[in-house]
From Swiss-Prot:
InterPro entries: Arna-like_SDR_e (IPR045869), Bifun_polymyxin_resist_ArnA (IPR021168), Epimerase_deHydtase (IPR001509), Formyl_trans_C (IPR005793), Formyl_transf_N (IPR002376), Formyl_transf_N_sf (IPR036477), Formyl_transferase-like_C_sf (IPR011034), Lipid_A_modif_metabolic_enz (IPR050177). One of its GO terms (molecular function) is UDP-4-amino-4-deoxy-L-arabinose formyltransferase activity. One of its GO terms (biological process) is lipopolysaccharide biosynthetic process. Pfam families: Epimerase, Formyl_trans_C, Formyl_trans_N. The active site is at residues 104, 434, 619. Homohexamer, formed by a dimer of trimers. Residues 314-667 are annotated as: Dehydrogenase ArnADH. Pathway: Nucleotide-sugar biosynthesis; UDP-4-deoxy-4-formamido-beta-L-arabinose biosynthesis; UDP-4-deoxy-4-formamido-beta-L-arabinose from UDP-alpha-D-glucuronate: step 1/3; Nucleotide-sugar biosynthesis; UDP-4-deoxy-4-formamido-beta-L-arabinose biosynthesis; UDP-4-deoxy-4-formamido-beta-L-arabinose from UDP-alpha-D-glucuronate: step 3/3; Bacterial outer membrane biogenesis; lipopolysaccharide biosynthesis. This is Bifunctional polymyxin resistance protein ArnA. UDP-alpha-D-glucuronate binds at residues 393, 398, 432-433, 460, 492, 526-535, 613. In the N-terminal section; belongs to the Fmt family. UDP-L-Ara4N formyltransferase subfamily. In the C-terminal section; belongs to the NAD(P)-dependent epimerase/dehydratase family. UDP-glucuronic acid decarboxylase subfamily.
Length: 667
C-alpha cells in the first residue's frame, strides 16, 4: 500500500518507523524545518527519513497547488499525519482512496487542538492517550480507528508524559497499521457533545496566578517544566522560574503569593500552599528552593506576583449593577482577589457586600437603577467592562408581576445597553437558560438551538422573551455599530448567599432556598407537579470562574460570543434535589435547632405559581463554547454545593432565631 507521510516531532519518528516496519510503500515524507527559537528536545523526522532512504520535503505551504499536483502524481493509497503542525486541505486528502489518518495526542473527542499533553497536566487529568482517527475538514473531529490509554501519575511532567505517549503511539500503530493494509477498519464516530478544544500555549501562559489553589499551580509547573520555558512569577521586577514543586494542604491566613517560609521555600496560594523544590533566578543557576531564596533575597512575608509595570498601569474598572445580588457579590469577591481590577457597584442593599466596603478597590453606592440613571451613565463612561446584573429572575414573579418583569428586565437594561453603545464600552450581559424555553434539543446549543416559548396567555414566558429580545438587540448593535459584547447564560447556579429566607417566605426565591425554608420552619416541602422537572445545577464557584475568564477576555476570545455556563453532569430533578437536601439536613450539626421534617407535598403548578405558568421537563446545556473559548470545565459535585448552601442558610437561621425578641420567640 502506497503511503504519503506528514510528520514531525518524536511521534512523527515513531509513526514513520512503524509504517516502515509494517511494510508500507512510503512514497514521500513531508516535515518542517527546524525552528531556531524552539528548544528541540525531540528526534528529527528528516534524519529518520534519510536513514530509511526516503524522499523528504519541508515546503512552506504544502497545500499550494504545485505541491498538491506533485502528491497527485505519487498516487497514494493512504495518507498519514503524525504530529504534523499544519492542516491538510480537502484537496490533498481526496487524493488517497483510503483517506487520511492523523495520530492525535489525546483520547478524542477530549482535548482537540494544540498542546494536548501540556493541557491535560494543566487541568489535572489522571488519564490521557493517543488516538488514530480519519481526517475530516474540522480539526481532530473525524471518526476513530483506535485508541491507547495512558495513565498520568501525580509526578508526571510534560517530558515524562511525552515519553509515555511515544510508547503508547508505538503500541497503537503496531496493532492498527498491519490491519489497515488488509482493508478499511471499522471507524467509530466521535461524540460531539463530549468534545473539548484547546488552543496553542505560549511561554507567557506559564505565569503563576497565586490566587489559584496549590494543586492547580503545581499542575501548571508540571505542565511547563523543562524542556518547556517553565512556570514563573516575579519578586518585584525580578523573574523567578519554578521547575519542581509540591502542593501542601496547609491552612493559612496570608494573601496569595505571600512567602510563608524560606526553608523550605513555601508560598501561600488561594487554597493551600506551594513548596518550591527547585527553581532559577533570571540570571542564576538551577538550584534548590532554599538556595533560590538566599540568592534572590526572598524573606518571609514578601509577596510574589505579577511583574510591576514601569509605567503605572490602571486597573480595569468593572461596573456591576446589582452588585449585592447572588452573582454580583461572588463576582466582586473574585475580582478583588486580583490586583488588576477595580469594582464599582450599585444596588438597593449592601448586606451581602458589607465585607468589601473597606477595600480601596471597591466603590459602592446604594441606589436603584430606575432612579440613578445619571450616576449609571457617568460610570458606564468611566468604566471598562459593564455587567448589568439587575433583574427579576424568580419564576413566581413572571406570573405575579409580568409588567414589572418587563420594565426592569428589558426597559431599564436597554438603557444600559444603549449607553454602552454611546460610550463604546464592553458589555458582559447575563442572558439566561430560560431563553431556550421549551427547546426540544437534548442539549441546548448557543449557536444552533431553537428558542421555543409558549402562547401569549402563558405569562411566565415574559422573562424569557425579555431576555431573548435584549440578546438580539445586543447582537444587532455588535454587528451594526461595533458594540463589544459577550452574552453568558447561567444554568441554575447555586451556593451560599443565593436569595435569603425572607424572600422565600413571600415565595420570591429560587427552588433550593424555598426547600430550605420548608425544612427550617417545619412545613411540608412543596413539590410543584411532583418535582419531576430536571435541571443541571452549577456551583457558584464554578460559574464565577467562567464569568471571571469572560471578563478577562484574553486576546479578545470572548468578543461577540454566547456562552452557556452550566454543569451537565449535575443533572437532577427537583425531587432529587429535595431528597439530597433532606439527607444533609438530618445529618447537620445544627439539626436540633429546627422542627421535625413535615414530609413532601405534591402541588400543581397553577396552584403554586398562579394562572399562566408553564414549565419545561429538562434544561441541559451544551458547554462546548465554554470549554473551547474559556478552557473551562465545571468541577464541583452537586452534593458539595447542596451541603455548603444548606450550611449557610441554617447558620443564618440560627443567628436570626438568637437575635429575635423574646416575645416573638414565645408567640
Amino acid at each position: 500500500m502506497k503511503a504519503i507521510v506528514f510528520a514531525y516531532h518524536d511521534i512523527g519518528c515513531v509513526g514513520l518507523n512503524a509504517l516502515a516496519e509494517a511494510g508500507y510503500d512510503i512514497q514521500a515524507v513531508f516535515t518542517h524545518t527546524d525552528n531556531p527559537g524552539e528548544n528541540r528536545f525531540f528526534s528529527s523526522v528528516a534524519r529518520v527519513a534519510a536513514d530509511l532512504a526516503l524522499p523528504v520535503f519541508a515546503p512552506e505551504d504544502v497545500n499550494h497547488p504545485l505541491w498538491v499536483e506533485r502528491i497527485r502524481e505519487l498516487q497514494p493509497d493512504i495518507i498519514f499525519s503524525f504530529y504534523y503542525r499544519n492542516m491538510l486541505s480537502d484537496e490533498i486528502l481526496s487524493l488517497a482512496p483510503q483517506g487520511g489518518f492523523n495520530l492525535h495526542g489525546s483520547l478524542l473527542p477530549q482535548y482537540r487542538g494544540r498542546a494536548p499533553i501540556n493541557w491535560v497536566l494543566v487541568n489535572g487529568e489522571t488519564e490521557t492517550g493517543v488516538t488514530l482517527h480519519q481526517m475530516v475538514k474540522k480539526a481532530d473531529a473525524g471518526p476513530i480507528a483506535g485508541q491507547y490509554k495512558v495513565a498520568i501519575s501525580d509526578v508526571d511532567t510534560a517530558l515524562t508524559l511525552h515519553a509515555k505517549m511515544r510508547d503508547a503511539a508505538q503500541e497503537l500503530l503496531r496493532n492498527l497499521l498491519p490491519r489497515m493494509k488488509e482493508g478499511p477498519l471499522p471507524l467509530t464516530p466521535q461524540k460531539e457533545a463530549d468534545a473539548s478544544y484547546f488552543g496553542r500555549r505560549t511561554a507567557a501562559d506559564g505565569e503563576i496566578h497565586w490566587q489559584k489553589s496549590a494543586f492547580t499551580i503545581n499542575n501548571l509547573v508540571r505542565a511547563v517544566t523543562e524542556p518547556y520555558p517553565g512556570a514563573f512569577s516575579y519578586l518585584g521586577q525580578r523573574k523567578l522560574t519554578i521547575w519542581r514543586s509540591r502542593p501542601l494542604d496547609l491552612v493559612h491566613n496570608k494573601l496569595p503569593g505571600t512567602v510563608l517560609s524560606t526553608a523550605p521555600l513555601t508560598v501561600a496560594c488561594g487554597e493551600g500552599a506551594l513548596e518550591i523544590i527547585t527553581g532559577q533566578g533570571e540570571a542564576g543557576l538551577y538550584v534548590q528552593g532554599d538556595r533560590l531564596a538566599q540568592e534572590m533575597g526572598i524573606v518571609t512575608d514578601v509577596r510574589l506576583g505579577n511583574k510591576p509595570s514601569n509605567t503605572l498601569k490602571r486597573r480595569t474598572r468593572v461596573l456591576i449593577l446589582g452588585v449585592n445580588g447572588f452573582i454580583g457579590n461572588h463576582l466582586t469577591e473574585r475580582l478583588l482577589q486580583d490586583d488588576r481590577y477595580e469594582v464599582y457597584g450599585l444596588d438597593i442593599g449592601s448586606d451581602a457586600i458589607s465585607r468589601f466596603l473597606g477595600n480601596p478597590a471597591f466603590h459602592f453606592v446604594e441606589g436603584d437603577i430606575s432612579i440613578h440613571s445619571e450616576w449609571i451613565e457617568y460610570h458606564i463612561k468611566k468604566c471598562d467592562v459593564i455587567l448589568p446584573l439587575v433583574a427579576i429572575a424568580t419564576p413566581i414573579e413572571y406570573t405575579r408581576n409580568p409588567l414589572r418583569v418587563f420594565e426592569l428586565d428589558f426597559e431599564e437594561n436597554l438603557k444600559i445597553v444603549r449607553d454602552c453603545v454611546k460610550y463604546n464600552k464592553r458589555i458582559v450581559f447575563p442572558s439566561t437558560s430560560e431563553v431556550y424555553g421549551m427547546c426540544d434539543d437534548k442539549e441546548f446549543d448557543e449557536d444552533t438551538s431553537r428558542l421555543i416559548v409558549g402562547p401569549i396567555n402563558k405569562q411566565r414566558w415574559i422573562y424569557s422573551v425579555s431576555k431573548q429580545l435584549l440578546d438580539r438587540v445586543i447582537w444587532a448593535y455588535g454587528v451594526k455599530e461595533g458594540l463589544k459584547f459577550t452574552l453568558f447564560r447561567p444554568f441554575n447556579w447555586m451556593g451560599p448567599r443565593l436569595d435569603n429566607l425572607d424572600a422565600a417566605r413571600i415565595g420570591s426565591s429560587r427552588a433550593i432556598t424555598q426547600l430550605i425554608l420548608n425544612l427550617v420552619e417545619g412545613s411540608p416541602i412543596k413539590l410543584v407537579d411532583g418535582g419531576a422537572q430536571k435541571r443541571c445545577f452549577t456551583d457558584i464557584h464554578d460559574g464565577i470562574e467562567a464569568l471571571f475568564r469572560i471578563i478577562e477576555n484574553r486576546d479578545g476570545c470572548c468578543d461577540g460570543q454566547i456562552i452557556n455556563i452550566g454543569n451537565p453532569t449535575n443533572e437532577a430533578s427537583i425531587r432529587e434535589l429535595a431528597e439530597m437536601l433532606l439527607t444533609s439536613f438530618e445529618n447537620h450539626e445544627l439539626r436540633d435547632h429546627f422542627p421535625p421534617f413535615a414530609g413532601f407535598k405534591d402541588i400543581e403548578s397553577s396552584a403554586y405559581y398562579g394562572k399562566g405558568y408553564q414549565d419545561v421537563e429538562y434544561r441541559t446545556p451544551s458547554i462546548k463554547n465554554a470549554r473551547r473559548i474559556l478552557h473551562w470545565q465545571p468541577e464541583i459535585a452537586m452534593q458539595q454545593t447542596v451541603t455548603e448552601t444548606l450550611d449557610f442558610f441554617l447558620r443564618a437561621a440560627v443567628i436570626e432565631k438568637t437575635a429575635a425578641p423574646k416575645d416573638e420567640l414565645n408567640a
